[in-house]
Amino acid sequence: MLQIEGRSAGDCRVRFEGKRYTPFPASRGVWEIFLPLGIKTAGERELILERISSDGPAEEYSFYVEVAPREIRTIHLGKASQAMRSSQPSIPEQQKKVLKAIRNVEPKRYWTRPFSSPVQGEISTEFGLRRDLGTYSYYHWGVDFSAAEGTPVWTANSGKVILSESGFNVYGNLLIIDHGQGVVSCYFHLSKILKETGDMVDRNEVIGEVGNTGWSTGPHLHFAVYLQGRAVDPFWLVSFTSK
């Protein structure tokens, strides 16, 4: 989280990791934004603060932050997982809908309380795990909770449902909630969806039930959090907002 204070804070932009971000008003004279980190980002990184001026070039101020490396585990998926992906290939139009939703940036902030875990269940797969299928590999951009089918799933925080869809090949039945200011949460592989696109939801409101839909080999909830369109560890956000 980056906070900028001062009368001209609203005229500032931030450049970090090759992207430009616009902070949001938090209170009088205070602007802030969550800056996401890539999973492999480590070491000293430059952060550039731009102060936009109407009568001249922007002023730039450089800061450096030290990023601790993240340990990344790798698991090798078996033939069952490979066969499932072959029989249920990802569909471009479905993927585009999900990508558009997770990249949504709504200036309004919907939440005021800490984020929380969305289901009662054991963690079966952690964030950032590298999955190797032999011919290719990919990272697990969320946390999987193992739970019985039909277990209630609730919102991690208040927000607006921006995507409610069923029958997606990869994600199954899904809900995506916009919490405002670039914070988006995802709930995949549901058996039942209880909210529609456009619905406003409160923190800890039941929105669906755990299922086994899409690319899934057993009942579980895939819970993901995106900041400014980039996946981050959901438990980091839960911990940070609880301080």
Describe every region a protein language model picked out.
Residues P152-L163, L194-V210:
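Short, well-structured beta-strand-loop connectors
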Residues A156-L194, P219:
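Zn2+-dependent peptidoglycan hydrolase active-site motif and core
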Residues S146, P152-A156, Y187-F188, G198-V201, ...:
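Small beta-strand-rich domains/subdomains or short beta-sheet motifs embedded
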